[in-house]
Design a protein with these regions (language model features):
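Membrane transport/envelope proteins' first extracytoplasmic loop
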Residues: 2-225
Length: 225
């Protein structure tokens, strides 16, 4: 019968062999390397997910040609998710004898849920904001130059007279190469009251949600069903 003492003596003798120690060392190194790769892959995946969320302004976005029904918002809130509604469309800005085509985002006060809407400041500091209040509009530098305007002045968009309260420096989705026109952000309520989102408009509606990964995944599955 093999005793414990015999097993211990055998292990001690085998451990003195360089080949065995090299093999065990290689196995340990492989385990450590695999663990490091798995950790790195998980971090990269999280970074990619976060970058995508910052790009669209939320953890998940649902696009539609018409406004989504209230059921979509109610379901998100039932899961403990935050929501934001917006619409994107082209429109023309007028001031005196000048006009300029704009790519407009009309958003509610919660936008963006992820990422930053940054307005330029003359002192060089960033100014992170949400969408403007009713009666206000943000324009990017190209729009201001084209219209010969500055912050604090007024501009007409879609028949609505708005005060320019900020210069857009950065916004979610602002790197879209398809949007060749200068950018503007206005209140969703103003766009609705001006009839810019009515029948026949070229608006693209979007509902954004944000929250913990599990309820976001549950909401995605529900929306796809």
């Amino acid at each position: 019968m093999i005793t414990a003492r015999f097993v211990i003596r055998t292990l001690r003798r085998e451990w003195r062999l360089p080949e065995l120690r090299t093999l065990i060392g290689a196995l340990l190194l492989s385990v450590v390397a695999l663990g490091a790769v798995a950790t790195l892959a998980a971090r990269v995946q999280r970074a990619v997910v976060m970058s995508a969320a910052e790009l669209i302004g939320g953890d998940l976005g649902i696009n539609a040609a018409t406004p989504l029904s209230a059921e979509f918002v109610q379901r998100a809130h039932a899961l403990g998710l935050r929501t934001s509604a917006l619409a994107e469309f082209p429109s023309v800005a007028f001031v005196n004898d000048r006009s300029q085509l704009l790519q407009v985002v009309a958003a509610d006060a919660a936008w963006p849920l992820r990422g930053k809407l940054v307005l330029a400041r003359h002192d060089g500091a960033d100014r992170s904001m949400h969408a403007p209040s009713a009666g206000q509009i943000y324009l990017d530098h190209r729009a201001l130059v084209a219209l010969g305007l500055a912050t604090g002045e007024r501009v007409q968009v879609g028949g609505v007279d708005l005060v320019i309260t900020g210069e857009i420096e950065q916004q979610p989705g602002g790197g879209d190469l398809v949007a060749l026109a200068p950018r503007a952000v206005m209140a969703l309520a103003d766009a609705k009251s001006a009839g810019l989102l009515g029948t026949g408009s070229r608006a693209r509606h979007r509902l954004l949600v944000a929250g913990a990964p599990t309820p976001v995944a549950a909401y995605r599955a529900w929306a796809k069903a």
